[in-house]
Amino acid sequence: MAENAIKDVLKDVLKHTHSLGIFEMVKISGTGSSTEVETVDADKTVIFKGSMVNPVADFVDSTVGLSRMNVLDGYLKYPGFDSDVATVQVIKQSRNGVDVPTEVAFVDENGTDAHYRFMLADVVNAQLKEIKFKGADLDLSIVPSQKNLKDLAYFNGVLSAFESTFSPRTEDGKLYFYIGDAGGDRTKILINDAPNGQITHEFKWPLDVVLKILRLGDSAGIVMSINTKGLLQIKVSSGIGEYTYLLPAKG
């Protein structure tokens, strides 16, 4: 990868993890053919798995962790480090005879520098256990529109103080998102046609978190899928990475 290309990779990873405000750390593992990213929040509300479109040379045969992500995010957003003439590179050190990534070094054109330390592999592996997911059949998939996002955000603003979840259900060949329950304040929002899928169980997911994920990219690069066993999957493609968010239902 070109010099400073790591900056774009780190920005993209943080955008799709740290910006959601629910993940404490992220694990990055690489080989010569792939670079994988994964994490899960403390409550296991969202399981995150990502793969970079192109393998990242700095992480080949290595595993590192990102914690204190607000520090890394702050460095990446500093105008001096974000300029084309700044240098951003991964520094490696020898450990047990093997060169491993230990930090990211930032230097601007005036000589101002900053350093961000990675979590070592054994530390992140101990704190963020391997996330196993064998996959699942998905019964209904849609590409959310901008109108969907606006409608969901609007009614979330109206009802979130009283109801923080939503329930997707199909009715007469259409998919609706229900917020609130019978006997209280509620709304039913038309999302899309669903001629080939059927979701009738009243599974619930946190609307605020789902909205944050859906806002990560333009609607054309997002696919939302649901299965009848209570799994919501959102796939986001950024051009730099392909990211999958898995949300087990709450009820």
Language model regions located:
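DNA polymerase processivity clamps
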Residues: 1-116, 138-251
